């Protein structure tokens, strides 16, 4: 396809104010040397982080650190934000043409980026499932932070998208015990689909070597302190944005020598930082998606035109989703 045939405009989703989003037209440049034009097939709404952006709740002190790789605008808005996009290279270097790719790009129907920003989706990974690459990457980074060992007892608190991903990867480890813990009994259905034991917080087993906390709640983090064993470690994978969290650190926290360590996907985990790049981590993540068990996280679909309404429904709690997929028009339907 020649540059003359390419549309002069693209359409992207922007957060334009607190709890307000819209689709906006913008110019689409021709790709330069080392760049590719990507036509989007699917994108995914990363509910936790994207709703923080939707609510204009990104703390000013971390606004720069929380920028997405291809974000435009700045927090609180207007801002073009998102990072789960899968598409097809329509124009670019010869060895990239026609390739299905993942990109940490906002919700947009076509975009031009350096090919260094793209990750090839391997054979055996459907494009729709490949949307999960960025979230699997977060889980991979958390496991690299924690370094689970043979025979460990592990709990994952919070059976949402990130917690479920962590449990999915851990289920292949030779652990003595793994529990996925959540207040919502309906999450047992997800645990069953993943082949992981499920527990209500009151019934979760204590004396864990590692607890991954992914519930983004004060109660979940407090429960983590109760479940982790002496001198054990809590890997905090939640982002609380502008919310304050209180913890009972005056009880036995010091006597038991417990540790709470943050894991954030913006940088490769310290244990692998000198030997793995962000690109290596993404390639690891997308290869893991050959396992069809990950389809359990794809819980709904809206069209690109419906994206603003879908975000509002997720915000209002009227749309229950782990990863809500946005489906883009095919080339044929846009002619």
List each model region and its residues.
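C-terminal hydrophobic helical "lid"/dimerization subdomain
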Residues: 4-8, 276-335
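Glycine-rich beta-strand-centered segment in the early N-terminal region that forms part
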Residues: 29-44, 53-105
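A structural motif shared across PLP-dependent enzymes of the aminotransferase-like
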Residues: 102-115
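Mid-domain Rossmann-like dinucleotide-binding core that forms the NAD(H)/NADP(H) cofactor-binding site
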Residues: 126-201
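A generic alpha-to-beta junction signature in SAM-dependent methyltransferases
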Residues: 147-148, 215, 228-229
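Helix N-cap at the beta1-alpha1 junction of Rossmann-like dinucleotide-binding domains, i.e.
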Residues: 184-187, 218, 241
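A short acidic, Gly/Pro-enriched loop at the edge of an enzyme's catalytic core
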Residues: 204-211
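Glycine-rich phosphate-binding loop and adjacent beta-alpha segment
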Residues: 222-287, 328-335
């Amino acid at each position: 396809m020649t540059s003359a045939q390419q549309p002069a405009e693209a359409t992207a989703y922007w957060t334009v104010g607190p709890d307000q989003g819209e689709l906006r037209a913008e110019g689409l440049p021709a790709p330069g040397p080392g760049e590719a034009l990507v036509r989007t097939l699917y994108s995914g709404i990363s509910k936790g982080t994207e709703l923080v952006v939707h609510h204009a709740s990104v703390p000013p002190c971390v606004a720069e650190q929380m920028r997405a790789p291809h974000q435009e605008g700045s927090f609180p808005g207007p801002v073009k934000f998102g990072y789960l996009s899968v598409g097809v290279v329509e124009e670019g270097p010869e060895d990239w043409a026609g390739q299905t790719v993942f990109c940490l790009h906002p919700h947009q129907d076509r975009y031009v980026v350096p090919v260094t920003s793209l990750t090839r989706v391997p054979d055996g990974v459907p494009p729709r499932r490949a949307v999960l690459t960025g979230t699997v990457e977060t889980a991979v980074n958390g496991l690299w932070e924690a370094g689970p060992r043979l025979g460990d007892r592990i709990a994952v608190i919070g059976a949402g998208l990130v917690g479920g991903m962590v449990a999915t990867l851990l289920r292949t480890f030779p652990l003595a015990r793994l529990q996925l813990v959540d207040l919502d009994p309906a999450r047992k259905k997800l645990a069953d689909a993943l082949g992981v034991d499920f527990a209500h917080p009151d019934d979760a087993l204590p004396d864990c070597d590692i607890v991954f906390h992914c519930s983004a709640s004060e109660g979940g983090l407090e429960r983590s302190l109760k479940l982790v064993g002496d001198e054990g470690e809590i890997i905090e994978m939640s982002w609380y944005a502008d919310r304050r969290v209180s913890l009972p650190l005056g009880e036995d926290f010091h006597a038991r020598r417990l540790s709470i360590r943050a894991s954030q996907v913006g940088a490769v985990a310290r244990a692998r930082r000198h030997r793995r790049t962000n690109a290596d981590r993404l390639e690891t993540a997308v290869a893991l998606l050959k396992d069809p068990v990950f389809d359990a996280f794809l819980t709904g679909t809206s069209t690109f035109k419906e994206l603003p309404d879908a975000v509002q429904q997720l915000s209002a709690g009227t749309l229950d989703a782990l990863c809500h997929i946005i489906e883009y028009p095919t080339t044929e339907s846009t002619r």
